[in-house]
């Protein structure tokens, strides 16, 4: 007899909750991909003589002995030099070395996880890079996590008073303030602390929000409230980042701007390979390596 996919003792409606979360992540993926393709069509500034980019979707399954898979959607265009919008739903058992790091996994190593992950590296250095992900994880416990953060690549724009950063933070603050289960000040600080390159003593970007292990008490709305907040994070991102791109994507840039962008991308590589929790989680749970490492920029420079 096959072992059950999940530990015993979970809520009776856990399968309905899993299905709802998975459906939302996939719907958000389609919404964002359509929005980014529309932006590709709208470019009139530098490089507008190039063809507009389109996403190429590739489904994948986990390696033999593991369960689940996902869809990797990649685009290389005239606005987005490289952008990936990925969804995955995976299940199996955590390795012994990983169990102590995941809530509920030390009691039973079985897990289920579903989520969306996005990273965009624009062509124009005036357009900030961005990252967003949200996820639901089930072990003997279950919770939501995720966030969104902005990375301007020009030093003169890596300030908290820059209009793009102000707009991005305001969008995340509004999303948080709509939900009693969310704490914007806490999530903003968590983002600043998480997306920090310790070996260089500098932040990766200008921040956003980051949250994990969100499992609210029933009196606050429980799972439904956490899921509603997680959906609003995705909706807020899908509105604010295209607006930021449209504000900047037709602006001219210099060779110095491009060099600055490539150096800043190098910092992005350093963070993702040294510190990023999602990268480590994916590689240690039999995730799709191509999808996991697709967050890395196409061209970088170390001075």
UniProtKB/Swiss-Prot annotation:
Signal peptide boundaries: none
SUPFAM superfamilies assigned: Coproporphyrinogen III oxidase
Segments for region (Important for dimerization): 268-303
Protein residues bound to a divalent metal cation: 121, 131, 169, 199
Alphabetically ordered keywords of this record: Cytoplasm, Heme biosynthesis, Metal-binding, Oxidoreductase, Porphyrin biosynthesis
Active-site residues (renumbered): 131 (proton donor)
Gene Ontology CC terms: cytoplasm
Domain of life (superkingdom): Bacteria
GO MF terms held by the record: coproporphyrinogen oxidase activity; metal ion binding; protein homodimerization activity
GO biological process, one term: protoporphyrinogen IX biosynthetic process
Enzyme Commission number(s) of this protein: 1.3.3.3
Family of the protein in this entry: Belongs to the aerobic coproporphyrinogen-III oxidase family.
Subunit structure: Homodimer.
The name this protein goes by in its record: Oxygen-dependent coproporphyrinogen-III oxidase
Phylogenetic classification of the source organism: Bacteria, Pseudomonadati, Pseudomonadota, Alphaproteobacteria, Hyphomicrobiales
